[in-house]
């Protein structure tokens, strides 16, 4: 793992969390219980404090950063999709930020809300509970349905289960020269399917 102290502050990672070896955590970073931090994620706590609360996930290539005297927070069971950028914002409990979205300084995403992929949430935005946000700049288009929230929670559960699976079986290796016969397919732990 790539952990770096900065001006005396050392990242704090709960022993039940999983941080991929290619992720980078610098300085004032706090990672809670059961959190998943994916490959190539950058959590750079060299100005503001970065907090990832219990059960949340920060997926591949995500960036977290913020200004001095601010906290960038991903709330409990938060779900941050591949390539998202969080800068000085607060993501509420059980909220989802879609792939390649950008959430700017002082923005607050409400609990159980969903930010659609590729959205841009402006600095200072104040969201409410259970909003579907989309666009550039993002705006609330409607409430998150019960089915959508259930789908989000299944996806988050997959990442929470992935923590244990990674602790148990992920290790560096050399590639095979060819595919073996009857190569098995990996299975998830829930019945979640992609949204159509």
UniProtKB/Swiss-Prot annotation:
What keywords is this UniProt entry annotated with? Repeat, Transferase
Q: Where is this region: Disordered?
A: 177-196
Q: Which Gene3D superfamilies match?
A: Hexapeptide repeat proteins
Q: Does the keyword Acetylation apply?
A: no
* Top-level taxonomic group: Bacteria
One MF annotation (Gene Ontology) recorded for this entry: transferase activity
What pathway is this protein said to act in by its record?
Amine and polyamine metabolism; carnitine metabolism
Q: Which Pfam families match?
A: Hexapep
Q: Which GO terms describe its biological process?
A: carnitine metabolic process
The entry assigns this protein to a family as follows: Belongs to the transferase hexapeptide repeat family.
Q: What's this chain's function?
A: Overproduction of CaiE stimulates the activity of CaiB and CaiD.
Q: Give the matching NCBIfam families.
A: PRK13627.1
Give the protein's recorded name: Carnitine operon protein CaiE
Biological source species = Escherichia coli O81 (strain ED1a)
């Amino acid at each position: 793992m790539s952990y770096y102290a900065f001006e005396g502050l050392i990242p704090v990672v709960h022993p039940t969390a999983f941080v991929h070896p290619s992720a980078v955590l610098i300085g004032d970073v706090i990672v809670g219980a059961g959190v998943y931090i994916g490959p190539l994620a950058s959590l750079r706590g060299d100005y503001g404090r970065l907090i990832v609360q219990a059960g949340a996930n920060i997926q591949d290539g995500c960036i977290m950063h913020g200004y001095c005297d601010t906290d960038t927070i991903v709330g409990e069971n938060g779900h941050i999709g591949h390539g998202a950028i969080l800068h000085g914002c607060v993501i509420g409990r059980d909220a989802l930020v879609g792939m390649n979205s950008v959430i700017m300084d002082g923005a607050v995403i409400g609990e159980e809300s969903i930010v659609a992929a590729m959205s841009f949430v402006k600095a200072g935005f104040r969201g409410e509970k259970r909003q579907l946000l989309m666009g550039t700049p993002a705006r609330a288009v409607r409430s998150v349905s019960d089915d959508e929230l259930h789908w989000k929670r299944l996806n988050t559960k997959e990442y929470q289960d992935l923590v244990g699976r990674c602790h148990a079986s992920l290790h560096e290796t050399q590639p095979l020269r060819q595919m073996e016969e009857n190569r098995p397919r990996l299975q998830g732990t829930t019945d979640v399917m992609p949204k159509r």
